[in-house]
């Protein structure tokens, strides 16, 4: 069942945890890819120096952050990679959730070829884990780029999120990664992941 628009009206800190275990659906190249979300980070523009929307900073690039919850925000980094975020909360709040890692559920050969130009059974165990264990890695594997920016994740199209299996798991809360510039926000425990999942980017 597709998650409805109301689900995304939750604040980023709540949504970042609620998204764990949910299933991303991506239809591309004639295949339907499925993956479980296993790691997220919350960003809250009003108080968070790590956020693109800190202190109400609003630009053409960051505009998706100020839209109503439930759309995709995809941005470009280092001149070659993409990161995928889910916008949370109400319009003009400037909040979002970075999706840091997926657990692939199907089409393993397709994903392996996208990431490493190899069949899945040719990969080492390390490479198998590395297919989607980071924000840019999962974008490569799932063909997520700027064309997904602003897409409504509650509409059944080629990119949306479904309710996952009713698994029981423990959520680990810890510091976010790669935000050394963010002063006191460095220490905010706003990264969340499923304990014991082998696809998380970093313990």
From Swiss-Prot:
Swiss-Prot/TrEMBL GO biological process terms: base-excision repair
First-level EC class: hydrolase
Family: Belongs to the DNA glycosylase MPG family.
Keyword terms: DNA damage, DNA repair, Hydrolase
Organism: Clostridium beijerinckii (strain ATCC 51743 / NCIMB 8052) (Clostridium acetobutylicum)
Protein name: Putative 3-methyladenine DNA glycosylase
Pfam families: Pur_DNA_glyco (PF02245)
A Gene Ontology molecular function term of the record: alkylbase DNA N-glycosylase activity
Family annotation (HAMAP family): 3MGH
Domain of life, per lineage: Bacteria
EC number(s) on file: 3.2.2.-
């Amino acid at each position: 069942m597709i998650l409805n628009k109301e689900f995304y009206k939750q604040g980023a800190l709540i949504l970042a945890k609620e998204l764990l275990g949910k299933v991303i659906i991506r239809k591309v190249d004639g295949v339907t890819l499925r993956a479980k979300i296993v790691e997220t980070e919350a960003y809250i523009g009003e108080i968070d120096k790590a956020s693109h929307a800190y202190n109400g900073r609003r630009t053409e690039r960051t505009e998706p952050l100020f839209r109503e919850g439930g759309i995709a925000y995809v941005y470009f980094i280092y001149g070659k990679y993409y990161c995928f975020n889910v916008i949370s909360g109400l319009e003009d709040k400037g909040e979002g959730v970075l999706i840091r890692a997926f657990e692939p559920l199907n089409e393993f050969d397709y994903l392996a070829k996208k990431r490493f130009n190899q069949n899945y059974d040719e990969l080492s165990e390390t490479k198998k884990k590395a297919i989607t264990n980071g924000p840019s890695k999962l974008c490569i594997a799932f063909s997520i780029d700027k064309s997904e920016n602003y897409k409504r994740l509650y509409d059944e199209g080629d990119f949306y999120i479904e309710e996952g299996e009713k698994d029981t798991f423990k959520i680990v809360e810890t510091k976010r990664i790669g935000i050394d510039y963010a002063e006191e926000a460095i220490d905010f425990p706003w990264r969340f992941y499923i304990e014991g999942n082998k696809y998380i980017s970093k313990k």
